[in-house]
Structures are given as C-alpha cells and as structure tokens.
C-alpha cells in the first residue's frame, strides 16, 4: 500500500514539474518582456524569417534562445508581410510573431527637403526612404493620367511637391504619396494665400516655381506664404 502511495506521489510530482516547465516556457514567450530596447524591422518581399530576425540587435534581446524558439515555431516565410515594423521595449517574444503575421506596420517619416526641381533627385530621395525603387517614382512623376487626377501634368508636377515631413507606411505606393502631397498642397492654398498670390499676379504653381528657384530656403511649407506675399 505504501509503495502504491509512493508511486502516486512521484507521478503527481512529475506532472507538477512538467506543467511547471511548460507553463514557464509559455510565460517566457507570451508574457515575459524579452527586449530592453527598440528595433526597426524592414520586411521586403521574398524575405525569410531568419533574415528578419537578423535585424534585431543581440544587444537588446534578453533571452535570444527564447526569441528564436518562439519566432521559428510561430512564423513561416510565407506569413511575412512586407512593411516597416517596430519591436518595442518590454514586449514579449510572441509580440514579434503577432506583429509580423498580422501586418501591424508602423509608419515612417518621409522627409522631402531641398530643391524639388529635378525628377531624378526627387525619385532618389523618395526611393531612399521607401520600399519603392527610383524607377517606380520616376514613372509616376511622368504619368500624365495619374497626375491629371491631381490637376497637374508632368512638366509642372514639381509644384505639387511641398517640402515637409510626411508620415506614411513604408510600403506606400506613389499614388499614396501623391495623395499626401495633394492634401498638403490644398491645405496650404487657403483663400487667404490664394489672394496674396493673386495680388502679386502669381498662380499657386508659379509661387511654387519661385520657391524652388530660391532653393526652398526653409523646409517648412508655411514659409511659402512669405513668397506669396505674407
């Protein structure tokens, strides 16, 4: 009888140990913070899980083995969605899996500054900050049909580009970016600014040309008002 009780006791202890180990691993991957800092991940089409993991600096990972185990067991290459993602401080390893699998992108700052009178320069500036390549940008800047929807043509598209910082998704298309530009353009050209430009005998497009000629001495869009007579 005592032997039977001993067997039951040992079996119960083994179950507790196993459940504790499983629970501990689950907690480590799903609840326990595993990052001491922030990391930006850029996922391009056809990237592998290992290539994405390689973008997380070892210096911010508390338990690297746990991260590898959780991500490799929760993600496969085909789960990855292109985009810019941010690993936040104090998040558990499983957050990386959920973020990448669900496409929880974080926007990036698209900075447009300096002279905007050369399409090649604009194309390179945008392509250097986005998933787009410079050829895609250049094609859009020469697309008569696309530009017509904004009230512009390839030869005056420069007037649509207002130097500023824009929050966009890294995977944004050129149409998305031009939508942002048009919104900024329309927001700037209030009745008051239109009247100021008209008083000087200038159209909004002509004001933009003048602003470019002086090399956009400020990257802050509202300073166009000084050129428009403000």
Model-derived segments and spans:
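Conserved catalytic or metal-liganding residues and their short signature motifs at active sites
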Residues: 1-230
């Amino acid at each position: 009888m005592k032997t039977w009780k001993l067997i039951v006791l040992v079996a119960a202890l083994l179950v507790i140990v196993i459940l504790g180990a499983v629970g501990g691993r689950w907690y480590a991957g799903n609840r326990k913070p595993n990052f001491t800092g922030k990391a930006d991940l850029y996922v391009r089409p056809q990237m592998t899980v290992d290539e994405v993991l390689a973008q997380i600096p070892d210096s911010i990972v508390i338990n690297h083995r746990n991260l590898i185990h959780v991500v490799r067991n929760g993600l496969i290459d085909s789960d990855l969605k292109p985009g810019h993602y941010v690993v936040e401080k104090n998040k558990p390893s499983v957050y990386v899996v959920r973020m990448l699998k669900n496409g929880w992108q974080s926007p990036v700052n698209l900075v447009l500054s300096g002279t905007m009178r050369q399409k090649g320069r604009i194309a390179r500036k945008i392509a250097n900050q986005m998933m787009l390549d410079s050829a895609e940008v250049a094609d859009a800047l020469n697309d008569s049909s696309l530009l017509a929807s904004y009230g512009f043509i390839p030869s005056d598209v420069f007037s649509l580009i207002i130097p500023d910082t824009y929050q966009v998704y890294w995977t944004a298309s050129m149409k998305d970016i031009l939508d942002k530009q048009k919104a900024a353009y329309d927001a700037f050209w209030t009745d008051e600014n239109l009247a100021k430009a008209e008083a000087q005998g200038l159209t909004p497009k002509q004001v933009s040309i003048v602003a470019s000629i002086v090399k956009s001495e400020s990257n802050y869009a509202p300073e166009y008002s000084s050129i428009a007579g403000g």
